[in-house]
């Protein structure tokens, strides 16, 4: 595991350390559209409060095995509110290629910094860990690696190949970055070992991309999934959206229509929760009735499965989502 220094406070130019893992204000002080906090923080409504149960033996077992294997999970790095439930149930979303992202998205709690070199042992270590945990369904995601010529696609393939060698019955979902400028090369590489589910999150409405997803492009992300589907029509494609960043209901519905127009099969929609006072603020809490409306509209549009609700995250109950969609 990386022992890199973690910096949270904004740094001056002379004190800036690109090798450090930057979090919170340190990460977001250099984004093009600065985060503007609203006057009063919205109070969390009752329906989005996570019921924190006592950590189970399985929870501690997974954490110990992850540390012993030098592996990261997005559950921990992104401060997911569902970590207790998922770890307790023996599921985790593994984050490969390090814990420092080359992007600085102000909704995300994953650290930013100059990435470390790829760990050539990670694919086998990951496969051994999954076999040890006897997992039947795994999600593999990664930080953005704009420093790599293939965006990290070969590392995904190496992980998938190793997992299938040691756990041939385990189903694999990958949650990939956008492979900015390298999508055709990445898709060609992924042909060697396509996943059971291909996931890439659109995150929000296109109007909010400059603020929420600096360095990303809405149409580019849609095209990535459409291109993958054309190459692998038998593999379900999936994408997720957050609500609460300042979008309207109609904008969410339009994103859903755009997804279907680009052959995306599965959908997740969840409430955005701000990781810190330095991140984008929550601009609205969406009522359960509105989530229900989104879910009903999703099935009318033809999605094979839609997981919609305040605490839904892209990887939350991913196995149940996939099985409900026929995977």
UniProtKB/Swiss-Prot annotation:
Record-linked Pfam families: LIAS_N, Radical_SAM
Q: Which cysteines are joined by disulfide bonds?
A: none
Family matches, as PROSITE patterns:
RADICAL_SAM
Q: Which GO terms describe its cellular component?
A: cytoplasm
Q: What class of enzyme is it?
A: transferase
> What positions does the entry give for [4Fe-4S] cluster 2 binding?
101, 105, 108
Q: Catalysed reaction per UniProt?
A: [[Fe-S] cluster scaffold protein carrying a second [4Fe-4S](2+) cluster] + N(6)-octanoyl-L-lysyl-[protein] + 2 oxidized [2Fe-2S]-[ferredoxin] + 2 S-adenosyl-L-methionine + 4 H(+) = [[Fe-S] cluster scaffold protein] + N(6)-[(R)-dihydrolipoyl]-L-lysyl-[protein] + 4 Fe(3+) + 2 hydrogen sulfide + 2 5'-deoxyadenosine + 2 L-methionine + 2 reduced [2Fe-2S]-[ferredoxin]
Q: What is its subcellular localisation?
A: Cytoplasm
Question: Recorded GO terms, molecular function?
Answer: 4 iron, 4 sulfur cluster binding; lipoate synthase activity; metal ion binding
Which amino acids does the record list as binding [4Fe-4S] cluster 1?
75, 80, 86, 315
Which CDD domains does the record associate with it? Answer: Radical_SAM
**What's the EC number here?**
2.8.1.8
Q: Which cofactor does it need?
A: [4Fe-4S] cluster
Q: In which pathway does it act?
A: Protein modification; protein lipoylation via endogenous pathway; protein N(6)-(lipoyl)lysine from octanoyl-[acyl-carrier-protein]: step 2/2
Its main subcellular localisation, reduced to a broad class, is: cytoplasm
Superkingdom of origin: Bacteria
Keywords of the record, alphabetical order, are:
4Fe-4S, Cytoplasm, Iron, Iron-sulfur, Metal-binding, S-adenosyl-L-methionine, Transferase
Free-text comment on the cofactor: Binds 2 [4Fe-4S] clusters per subunit. One cluster is coordinated with 3 cysteines and an exchangeable S-adenosyl-L-methionine.
Gene3D superfamilies linked to this entry: Aldolase class I (3.20.20.70)
| Annotated Radical SAM core domain residues | 87-304
User: NCBIfam families, from UniProt?
Assistant: lipA (TIGR00510), PRK05481.1 (NF004019), PRK12928.1 (NF009544)
Q: Which family does it belong to?
A: Belongs to the radical SAM superfamily. Lipoyl synthase family.
Q: Per its record, how is this protein called by name? A: Lipoyl synthase
The species this protein belongs to is Variovorax paradoxus (strain S110)
